[in-house]
A protein has these predicted regions:
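Short amphipathic alpha-helix with an adjacent loop that forms part of the alpha/beta core around
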Residues: 1, 237-247
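Acidic, Mg2+-coordinating active-site environments of NTP-dependent enzymes
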Residues: 5-153, 178-179, 204-207, 211-213, ...
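Short beta-strands and strand-loop turn motifs
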Residues: 9-14, 48, 182-188, 217-218, ...
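Glycine/threonine-rich flexible loop motifs
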Residues: 19-25, 166, 192-196, 262-263
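Short, well-ordered alpha-helical microsegments
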Residues: 54-55, 238, 261-262
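Active-site beta-alpha connecting loops in nucleotide-dependent enzymes
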Residues: 139-142, 158-229, 256
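Short acidic-hydrophobic, aromatic-tinged amphipathic segments that line or gate anion-handling sites
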Residues: 228-240
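Peripheral docking tails and interdomain loops at the edges
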Residues: 230-233, 248-266
Length: 266
């Protein structure tokens, strides 16, 4: 045991590191060890109420504080009419904060914002400090960064990727305003026996929308029957990208950490 937590939060149990954990149930079991400790030591768990499996995993914990979009101690929702790439959050119940204008890209960051507010209030942080911290935070290190380059807007989300985060990123990207959308996606690692199936599912998801260009990078796509542009190596994708001279495009760059997809922008 490396820590003896009094409070704990599991953001989600997505399809990440399936190879090491032996599947989704293994992921839940591994992450659930945090809740096991809290349950046995009268700890407090923060639960995102929208994910029913987290509520199930937290049963028996004596102190539970919930956040989410419905029926939670702290309620909030994304303001969808904002017309901006950035996430705006309206808080409906639980605090006196009304609205938070973040510099985060993607509605998939809503649970993270609500979790931060919920934890801050639990530990007595002033509303003004919570708002300032969230509104002034600018993502870095290839984590949902919004970059403006040569009249293009680039979402660099290349820190890591798994089927769950890829789905969230692509669906959010599809709903963003913009007519010239370019997908540049690297492979998803550590999926074990599920790798082929999950990459096939990703291609099916891509095909649900119209894109200006789709570029897939890595060996994981080599056996898939796709009509998209494919490169084995990031350096080849970078050379292709340089030759396109895109203007006024909206570009999503995402892939697992080992793919180093940020190099396509060098």
């Amino acid at each position: 045991k490396y820590a003896l937590p009094t409070h704990g939060l599991i953001t989600n149990c997505g399809k990440a590191h399936l190879e090491g954990f032996g599947g989704e149930e293994g992921v839940k079991k591994g992450k659930g060890e945090l809740f096991d400790y809290l349950r046995n030591n009268s700890g407090t768990a923060f639960i995102f109420n929208d994910y029913g499996y987290l509520s199930e995993m937290s049963k028996g914990i004596s102190n539970i504080i919930t956040y989410g979009t419905i029926d939670a101690d702290l309620n909030g929702e994304a303001i969808k009419e904002s017309g901006s790439e950035f996430l705006r959050v309206k808080i409906g119940k639980g605090v006196t904060i009304n609205e938070i204008n973040t510099q985060l890209v993607g509605g998939y960051n809503l649970p993270n914002v609500l979790a931060a507010v919920c934890i801050g209030k639990t530990f007595g942080v002033d509303d003004e400090q919570i708002i300032a911290a969230l509104e002034n935070y600018i993502p870095s290190n290839s984590r949902s960064q919004l970059i403006e380059k040569d009249s293009n807007r680039i979402i660099l989300d290349a820190y890591n990727a798994n089927p769950s985060s890829m789905k969230a990123a692509i669906e959010n990207f599809a709903n963003m305003p913009g007519n010239k959308k370019v997908l540049m996606l690297g492979g998803m690692m550590e999926l074990g026996d599920e790798s082929m199936t999950e990459h096939e599912n990703l291609v099916k998801l891509i095909n649900q929308n119209q894109w200006h260009k789709v570029v897939l990078v890595g060996k994981d796509y080599k056996d898939l029957p796709v009509s998209f542009i494919h490169f084995y190596d990031v350096s080849d994708a970078r050379n292709w990208f340089r030759e396109q001279h895109f203007m006024d495009a909206l570009i999503l760059v995402k892939g697992s950490r080992s793919m180093q997809m940020e190099k396509v922008l060098e």
